Structures are given as structure tokens and as C-alpha cells.
């Protein structure tokens, strides 16, 4: 991680679809999905570039068609950061829905009790420009891997 370029992650709206107490799981991929698989990975760091171990990275999103599961926990779950502040969770690139570009909601629960609520966006989406919540510093860095795509996103929180 290049500490010289760190900026605090943007605080963005939770939206109406958050559900408390999701399951802990490192893959949100459903067996019959037709979506593009992506591993979202990165670090939780303080503004002075120190890793945050044991942070809970809570993720929820629409499926590949742009629909949220409001009755169960499909495309909802969390992972914990390791001793180096690293997290990794497998999912699919979510679909758009009216007024919103592709995005993944995230709450980062710090051991101190502080919470960062934000959203992660994907590059190259024409709908980014028309989404009123879209924030450029929450744009994932995408790369291709042997099994699909990787979205690199570091979460930088106040000390």
C-alpha cells in the first residue's frame, strides 16, 4: 500500500436495504449465478497507514440483475480483517437498478466501535456519471485473474 496517497474513505449513505446480523462467509456467490465473479480485496487502514486487525467488513449488494434479497441473506455477509488489516470476499458484479450504477455497500466495523459506512463503485460504467451517490475515491481498481476479476479497494478510516 502506498501510504503517501492515502485519503480517508468517503462516508456514503447506507441506503434502504441494510440488514443487521448477516452471516460470516468469504463468498457471497450463489450457485446458479450468471453474474461476473469478482474478488473484492484490500486493506482496512488508519489515516496514518496503520493496519486495522479484526475489523468486520460487512457487505451487501444487489444481484447481477439489480435486485436485493430483502427476505434472506443472498449477497450479504461479512469477513474479518487479518493481523495485517487485509480482507477478501468473493461476489459478483451487481446489476444496475433505476437511478443507481453498479455498487457494493460496505460497513467497516472497527474494534474501537467506530463504523465507516460507504459504497464501492466499478470503473468504466457509463451510469457512474448520473448516479448522485457515486464518489470517485471509492472506485475499485480492477484487474483480471485466472478465475475472474479482482476489485482492489482499501478502506481508510479516521485514527
Regions found by a protein language model. Give the residues of each.
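Beta-strand-dominated extracellular/periplasmic modules and repeats
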Residues: 1-159
